[in-house]
Structure formats: structure tokens, C-alpha cells
A protein has these predicted regions:
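Short coil/linker segments at helix-helix boundaries
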Residues: 2-119, 131, 160-169
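TPR/Sel1-like alpha-solenoid repeat signature
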Residues: 76, 117-124, 136, 151-158
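Short helix-capping/linker turns of helical repeat alpha-solenoids
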Residues: 112, 146-148
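Short connector loops at secondary-structure junctions
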Residues: 108, 149-152
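Short loop/turn segments at strand-loop or loop-helix junctions that form parts
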Residues: 1-2, 153
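Solenoid-like repeat scaffolds
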Residues: 140-144
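A broadly tuned preference for mixed-charge, low-complexity surface segments
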Residues: 133-139
Length: 169
């Protein structure tokens, strides 16, 4: 796969990986594998399949590469590409709620999720995307050391008067 080819280059002496290609293929993997799981689950629901055949394998594969999303998000954020940063951090933070990972304890119980949610909130804040700020900062504010960043983003989002009910946070 494109992901495997570029990822291998990261670990070879003198290897130059095309990180844009690597990270974009990573996002596509999440998109396609999730869609594949949805289609398979629909076939199970309709009785066309007795039980899912791919879910475990898809979940394991994505759980293995999921930490790379933080690198992708960090690189994008540091380059000032907040839209991509939000995409990658968002994929990371959204994973525990994805039914595909229902049996993946490492994903469901990931203690880094609130920290990464802070970064997603910061990227969303830079984009003035208040809906995403509220979505991710609500998770990020639970992080003991970095939660204040999400609270600041929430204060800014709610302070703009778009959501008058500030008691939510």
C-alpha cells in the first residue's frame, strides 16, 4: 500500500518519505475501512451475511496505524495547515466512538484521547470553526495538564454569542 511504502522509508537509513502522501493515505485508510465496515454491517443486518468477516482485521489494522494520526496532525498544525490538523486530530479523537473499534480496548480506553482533543480544539479555533471547537474542547477539557487550552477555546467560542447557553461547559 502507499501507506506501507512511505512508512517504510521513514525507518530506512537515509530514507526520505513523502509525508504528505503518507498522511493522506492514512486518512483515506480510515475513510475506506470505515465505509467497508458499514457496508459489511448492513449486509449482516439484512441477513445477507451471517456475521462480519472483516471487522476484526480492519479494526486491528487501523488501531495499529492510528498513532500516526498524531504525527500527521502535529506536522500539519506546525505548518499552519489547521484544516488538515483538525482532520487528522479529529480522526484520532473520533475513533473510540466508531463502531468499528467496539472490541478494540486499546482504542476505547485510550488515555491520550483528551490530550489530542485539545489539539483538535486548537486547530478548530484557528479556523474559527466553533462547532468543532465545542465538539473537541468538550473532550479536551478533561485532560489534567492541558485541559485549560480547551476551556480557553470554549470560552472564546461561547463568548462570540453564537451559543448563549454557557452553562454547558
Amino acid at each position: 500500500s502507499i501507506y506501507d511504502d512511505e512508512n517504510m522509508k521513514l525507518y530506512l537509513p537515509g530514507g526520505q518519505a513523502d509525508t504528505a502522501k503518507l498522511y493522506n493515505s492514512l486518512a483515506k485508510m480510515f475513510e475506506y475501512y470505515t465505509k467497508c465496515d458499514e457496508v459489511e454491517q448492513a449486509k449482516v443486518q439484512s441477513g445477507e451475511l451471517k456475521k462480519p468477516k472483516l471487522r476484526k482485521k480492519l479494526a486491528k489494522t487501523l488501531a495499529t496505524v492510528r498513532p500516526q494520526l498524531t504525527n500527521a496532525g502535529s506536522d500539519a498544525y506546525n505548518a499552519g495547515n489547521y484544516a488538515n490538523a483538525l482532520k487528522f486530530f479529529g480522526l484520532y479523537v473520533d475513533a473510540p466512538q466508531n463502531p468499528l473499534f467496539a472490541d478494540e480496548d486499546a482504542v476505547k480506553n485510550d488515555t491520550l484521547t483528551p490530550l489530542i482533543a485539545n489539539y483538535a480544539a486548537l486547530a478548530a479555533n484557528s479556523l474559527k470553526d466553533n462547532a468543532a471547537v465545542i465538539k473537541y474542547a468538550t473532550i479536551g477539557k478533561e485532560h489534567k495538564e492541558e485541559g485549560y487550552r480547551s476551556l480557553m477555546c470554549l470560552a472564546e467560542a461561547y463568548g462570540k454569542g453564537e451559543t448563549p447557553d454557557s452553562a454547558k461547559w
